[in-house]
Amino acid sequence: MVMASAGVNMPGGDGDHPPAAAQECHRLRRRRYVPAAAAASEDGDNSSNGGGEKRSLPASSASPSPSPTSSAASSDCSSDRDDDGCSSTAGAAARRLPLPSGASTAAAVWPVAFGSVSLAGRMRDMEDAVSLRPSFCTWLDGSPMHFFAVFDGHGGPHVSALCREQMHVIVAEEMVAEAAALRQRQPAAMEEEEEERAVAGGAVAELRPGGRAGGGGVRVRARHRAGVPCPLSGQTGAIIGSTAVVALLVRDRLVVSNCGDSRAVLCRAGDPLPLSSDHKGLNPSLSWRGTRVALARGTWGDKTGQSVGPAALLLSGGAHPDRPDEKARIEAVGGRVVYLNGPRVRGILAMSRALGDKYLKPEVICEPDITITVRTVDDECLILASDGMWDVISNETASDVARQCLEDGSPTSGRRAARSGEAASSSAGAPAAAVGQESEPRCYRAAALLARLALGRESSDNISVVVIDLKGRG
């Protein structure tokens, strides 16, 4: 007769084993289920108490496999644990082993490499700024968050330079504050009510790995907060401003925020997918070297002909001054849109949204457009650039050039292309390229070739390009 107790089979005195063998069996089984230190103390207690009452084993104790040197008696008496609430050996071992951290998992599944180039081009002053901040902040589960941005200043470089130094700091502070609030949020049943109140008070974008059932999230709100003071004051400080296109990468989410006419384009399965809309008027045509390129607002379709997003060749078409709702907003606050070489706020600024431009308040606002994209295995690269490149290069061309550079490039050819790009810039009378942090030569090569192509197509503005490789080809 076999009696089960706490998941351990205990043979009775009328079994095949004599009492001495049964006692030895019990002792060996207890050694198998009790940690080494506890087993040693138990043996001492048993010897002093003359084999007194045995201690009960906790249900969560691990049960490693018998060692090869186990005696025949122990092998005869060994058996699996019952289904009376005790876990199996594999389950107990799994609880003891630490799970892989979110950061290591994200880094292995969602690689990120980047490179950037900035050229003054045919402008006398350099007003663009690029910010590359990998792992500037951490996700709630420990995953790294990456910050990439392009700022295109106007009226001077002061606002764009200030954004380069402070924007990622402000975003990190917001992330930390929202993460702390998120840990204390109300139950999930109250989530929708909170979101409705939040939407009524400002733009809300949510980052949720794994959807609603995911293991955490961070909510980023566009808030009215005190601005970072600029060292310039008076009229000089009132007439300067900057655009901003910012990309945050965390795990399988790609968050893009845009204010102005800089742009972010994702290359997915060979097709360009614009992730931002330009906040300036759409010129009727574009020309370089005598070639006119027709532009049109609308949507671009996938290979099935279905409309899936903004126009692939859309160089503008976001919150420009002559868009009906933007024009109504500007006129509601006492401003007006004047058509002077395109629609302009008060006939001065061709954008209806930008950072700075104090003299054009409240017509020109700094509220960004935010898009959230779930990354897929088809995502190849992300391109951030100022209008110095987008004014002469279409989304499709930029996507093709960057993709081919990343697929075919090598560190040696990347450096050679970089040197040739700098030589071409110097020979054209433009300053040499200002190279950003180079974490992947192929990314730098792609950015350098795009900047060189824009320069060859007679771009008249500063040119800044950031190429982010989402495939991890290194």
From Swiss-Prot:
Cofactor note: Binds 2 magnesium or manganese ions per subunit.
Enzyme Commission (EC) number: 3.1.3.16
EC class name: hydrolase
Named cofactor requirement(s): Mg(2+); Mn(2+)
InterPro entries hit by this protein: PP2C, PP2C_BS, PPM-type-like_dom_sf, PPM-type_phosphatase-like_dom
SUPFAM superfamilies registered for this protein in UniProt: PP2C-like (SSF81606)
Ranges of biased composition (kind: Low complexity): 57-77, 420-434
Annotated Mn(2+) 2 binding sites: D152, D387, D461
GO biological process assignments: regulation of intracellular signal transduction
Catalytic activity: O-phospho-L-seryl-[protein] + H2O = L-seryl-[protein] + phosphate; O-phospho-L-threonyl-[protein] + H2O = L-threonyl-[protein] + phosphate
Every PPM-type phosphatase domain range: 113-470
Binding positions (Mn(2+) 1): D152, G153
Keywords: Hydrolase, Magnesium, Manganese, Metal-binding, Protein phosphatase
Single GO term (MF): metal ion binding
Protein family per UniProt: Belongs to the PP2C family.
PANTHER family: PROTEIN PHOSPHATASE
Name of this protein: Probable protein phosphatase 2C 37
Taxonomic source organism: Oryza sativa subsp. japonica (Rice)
